[in-house]
Design a protein with these regions (language model features):
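N-terminal Rossmann-like NAD(P)+-binding domain of SDR-like oxidoreductases, especially those catalyzing
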Residues: 1-164, 289, 294-297, 303-320
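C-terminal substrate-binding subdomain of Rossmann-fold SDR/epimerase-dehydratase oxidoreductases
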Residues: 3, 39, 176, 182-320
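Short histidine/acidic/glycine/proline-rich micro-motifs that form metal-
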Residues: 16, 163-166, 196-197, 257-258
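Gly/Ser/Thr-rich beta-alpha loop segments that engage phosphate groups in nucleotides
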Residues: 22, 87, 113, 137, ...
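A glycine/serine/threonine-rich, flexible loop-to-helix segment
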Residues: 28, 116-117, 171-179, 255
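Conserved active-site helix of classical SDR/Rossmann-fold NAD(P)-dependent CH-OH oxidoreductases
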Residues: 86-87, 139-146, 176-179, 207-208, ...
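The catalytic Tyr-centered alpha-helix of NAD(P)H-dependent dehydrogenases
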Residues: 118, 130-137, 167, 171-175, ...
Length: 320
């Protein structure tokens, strides 16, 4: 954002949960127009104090608990952060006159699509049919954003993206998990038979789309953001093995996730038609850039895969 709009001031609010890492922001912290606040978005008093002091013109709401497996294990924190936190931010916008609110959401709110119907895609008109506690919490927040737009006149938009990948991705997610495990010659745990399909979106393409929506999206509208990169999970794992020169015998099939969605696929026609956005990164190119980043930044992720993450990994995969 600062590289594209150096005249803007960027305020970053983050609770720094297990997935937060200040080292990720080292570059931004050097910029004179960047400020960081370690704050829980559910802390109404702290959020109001920031809004009163800084008077932000717009809010882009990325903050969320986002890992499906953790939501299955303990849904409560997902409901608190993803729903109540969204309410607090919107209340702050209304109270302090913030002009724009953008909700960053997920295609998972639509549920899933059958594997044998490649012609079917999620559009903005697809009914919400969440499958997991995570996606239900995001769907609830989306509905709340729509209600605040209609009831209170909040100038709000929503985007629903497909699976992101790229640098700084927390290693509990599929692609960084497989890269980290492969580099350590550890088993590569794949749910079920690995046939579940996801549409992959490079993180920089996602950021470009959000910037366009923030500045040109129509109030009250939903915009789907997809990468046109549908891949089976097992095929991604095999590509990572090939890129790193690791044997496929590291692949270990584990008990499937409860309620595992079969296929996600997004139709991004609306954002292309209205705002001119298209993904620029081919999956093969984005995956190579991602792998190269993890190879060059081992200190960043090796420091993470210890402590709480190690305990979580054992709970998720040890006996499956």
């Amino acid at each position: 954002m600062l590289s594209a709009h150096p005249e803007d001031t960027l305020l970053c609010v983050d609770k720094l949960t297990y997935a937060g890492n200040l080292s990720t922001l080292e570059g931004a912290m050097q910029h004179p127009n960047f400020q960081f606040f370690k704050t829980d978005i559910c802390d109404r008093g702290a959020i109001y104090a920031i809004f009163e002091a800084e008077k932000p013109d717009a809010v882009v709401h990325f903050a969320a608990e986002s890992h499906v497996d953790r939501s299955i294990e303990d849904p409560e924190i997902f409901l608190r952060t993803n729903i109540l936190g969204t309410q607090v931010l919107m209340d702050a916008c209304l109270k302090f006159g913030t002009k724009r609110f953008h909700q960053v959401s997920t295609d998972e709110v639509y549920g899933d699509l059958p594997l044998d119907r490649p012609d079917l895609l999620f559009t903005e008109e697809t009914p919400i049919r969440a499958s997991s506690p995570y996606s239900a919490s995001k769907a609830s927040a989306d509905l709340l954003v729509g209600a605040y737009h209609r009831t209170y006149g909040l100038n709000a938009t929503i985007s629903r993206c497909s699976n992101n990948y790229g640098p700084y991705h927390f290693p509990e997610k599929l692609i960084p998990l497989m890269i980290a495990n492969a580099l350590a010659d550890k088993p590569l745990p794949v749910y079920g038979e690995g046939l579940n399909v996801r549409d992959w979106l490079y993180v920089e393409d996602h950021c470009r789309a959000i910037d366009l929506i923030l500045r040109g999206g129509r109030p009250g509208e939903v915009y789907n953001i997809g990468g046109h990169n549908e891949m089976r999970n097992i095929d991604i794992v095999r590509l990572i093995c090939e890129a790193l020169g690791k044997p496929e015998r590291l692949i270990t099939y584990v008990t499937d996730r409860k309620g595992h969605d079969l296929r996600y696929a997004i139709d991004p026609t609306k954002i292309h038609r209205e705002l001119g956005w298209l993904p620029e990164t081919r999956f093969e190119d984005g995956l190579k850039k991602t792998i190269d980043w993890y190879l060059s930044n081992r200190d960043w992720w090796e420091a993470i895969i210890s402590g709480e993450y190690r305990d979580y990994y054992e709970r998720m995969y040890k006996d499956r």
